[in-house]
Amino acid sequence: MEKPNATVAVIGAGDYIGGAVAKRFAAGGFHVYAGRRNGDHLKGLYDEIAAAGGHCTGRSLDARKEEDVAAFLKEADEIAPLEVCVFNIGGNVNNPLLDTTERVFRKVWEMACYAGFLTGREAARQMLPRGKGSIFFTGATASLRGGNGYAAFASAKFGLRAVAQSMARELGPKNVHVAHLVIDAGVDTAWVRERRGGDAANLPPDTLMNPTSIAETYWQLHHQPRDAWTFELDLRPFGETW
């Protein structure tokens, strides 16, 4: 594959949605600059993308630290122009209200909302001088509904959605596409399968969301013509109740 002429930064490049997004954009010719809390866990992603002929580098990143996020996205832009930035940090916790400590509430907010603000702002700093780019935020069911035991997580995801809305209204006229993707169902991960019974053979097909299928939507969003941009969409399996 030829040397990429654009970079996608994936903040929260974990083993499922983040990794799948990285692989999809690498297959499309982008250099992937991947960040996650423990950079040692990125080796498998590097190897898989390289084996497919793509380009991927990255490092450890604390997305709650302003200077770290700014440096990370500047580094991404120095590899090749930063064209896409994906914020994919979760922070999902489920605690009864009276068991939710100040520390937990603050940490979840820092991870799922404040880090998204930092990411969006610093990505915009790199994109606005060129007058183009895409900034995508991964949301959840909790972005729209505060469930029982999800006071910390839902408040942070509500906040992230508001940050994304505000950014979209400000940056859209400057040719930067901001979108918020509501992942409104269980993603096919080992943790989710364990909660639903453990044995994959016992689960009906296509009732959990395949990260590869989700990643395809990020790819399609980036290639939307700007006369018909999507700000928000929700994704769920065909049989999901909603």
Regions found by a protein language model. Name each.
Residues G29-G44:
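Conserved glycine-rich Rossmann-like NAD(P)H-binding loop of the short-chain dehydrogenase/reductase
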Residues I49-E67:
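Rossmann-fold cofactor-recognition segment
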Residues P96-L97, V104-W109:
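Substrate-binding pocket helix/loop in short-chain dehydrogenase/reductase
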Residues G120-R121, Q165:
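A short, exposed helix-loop element centered on a Lys and neighboring polar residues
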Residues P173-A185, A200-W242:
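C-terminal helical subdomain
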